[in-house]
């Protein structure tokens, strides 16, 4: 156990040894506009490791003083990665407004003028205390051993892909040691390996692999987001967390009127897509279309343009290892998406 012996000195004591070290606890201040446009000063300190995540005080997190090299670029970053610190593909900077509540997320989403602004705001969102605590705990004290010396993104993961894409893929949520580490959708885990390989076979990705942000990977003709943008404990976001994240994807689709195909990876993504478009005033078949691999539902935008929703089993290890989802099955859904999109 640890006992405090002074403002900057801690002592670890057990039955066999006594180890003493000094640790400077950094205090970093910075100014950042909140959702109402006013400037607030936030102060962040590095907490002592704990099994229980620290309560979110509403401040935008700054990097820990200890840094680790990015596995590709070699640049040093703290974890979580501060906005605008040079991480490959980071859409935000120190001036990006931050949502601290579900209502704030909805207001910031609605006011985003374009896709780059939306991506930036997504990537610094702090609307859900449980998700903020979990993603940052994993990024600091809960890293997987094989990635212990890598910096962790530790922030919400924005969508990836061109704003003029005609295919939009909806995932579930970032993996704690995957996208929560790399900062890019479906990057750094087995599910991502499967998905990007399939994209590449379909001519929808620049490369067959996606390991790190900055590795040259990029979607071609498709854009990909998720129902929830933060890694959730046990991969299970709550109903309230899914609802709080909904405005981000709603605004994204509103800014992409050329989309003709939605591909839902799993039942939660399917339900999210239907809920988003129904709230946006799209025509949705009744009764509610049921999810299934290869399922199709024809939706109608308010202007009458048809958009097809396609279902695919999620490329989780549970599905791919058991054969519930095969490469041929995933290829079939993507081929159908390409056909419907006019590619």
Stretch-by-stretch model annotation:
Residues 6, 30-31, 37:
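Intrinsically disordered, low-complexity segments enriched in small polar residues
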Residues 19, 40-42:
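Low-complexity, intrinsically disordered or signal/transmembrane-proximal segments
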Residues 25-26:
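Intrinsic low-complexity, disordered N-terminal segments enriched in polar/charged/small residues
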Residues 69-299, 303-343:
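A polyanion-binding, active-site-adjacent surface
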């Amino acid at each position: 156990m640890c006992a405090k012996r002074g403002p900057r000195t801690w002592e670890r004591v057990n039955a066999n040894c006594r180890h003493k070290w000094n640790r400077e606890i950094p205090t970093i201040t910075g100014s950042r506009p909140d959702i109402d446009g006013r400037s607030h000063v936030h102060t962040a300190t590095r907490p002592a490791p704990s099994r229980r995540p620290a309560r979110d005080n509403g401040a935008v997190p700054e990097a820990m003083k200890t840094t680790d090299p990015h596995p590709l670029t070699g640049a040093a970053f703290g974890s979580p990665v501060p906005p605008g610190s040079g991480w490959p593909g980071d859409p935000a900077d120190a001036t990006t407004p931050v949502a601290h509540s579900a209502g704030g997320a909805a207001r910031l989403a609605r006011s985003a003028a374009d896709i780059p602004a939306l991506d930036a705001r997504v990537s610094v969102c702090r609307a859900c205390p449980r998700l903020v605590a979990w993603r940052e705990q994993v990024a600091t004290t809960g890293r997987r051993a094989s990635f212990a010396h890598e910096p962790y993104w530790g922030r919400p993961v924005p969508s990836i892909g061109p704003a003029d894409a005609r295919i939009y893929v909806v995932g579930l949520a970032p993996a704690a040691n995957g996208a929560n580490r790399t900062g890019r959708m479906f990057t750094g885990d087995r599910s991502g390996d499967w998905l990007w390989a399939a994209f590449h076979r379909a001519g929808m990705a620049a490369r067959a692999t996606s390991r790190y942000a900055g590795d040259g990977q990029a979607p071609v003709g498709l854009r990909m987001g998720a129902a929830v943008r933060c890694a959730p404990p046990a991969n299970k976001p709550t109903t309230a967390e899914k609802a709080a994240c909904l405005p981000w994807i709603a605004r994204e689709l509103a800014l992409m009127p050329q989309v003709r195909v939605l591909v839902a990876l799993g039942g939660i993504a399917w339900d999210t897509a239907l809920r988003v478009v129904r709230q946006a005033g799209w025509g949705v078949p009744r009764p509610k279309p049921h999810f299934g691999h290869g399922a199709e539902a024809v939706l109608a935008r308010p202007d009458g343009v048809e958009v097809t929703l396609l279902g695919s089993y999620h490329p989780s290890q549970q599905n791919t290892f058991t054969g519930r989802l095969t490469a041929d099955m995933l290829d079939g859904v993507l081929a159908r998406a390409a056909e419907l999109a006019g590619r």
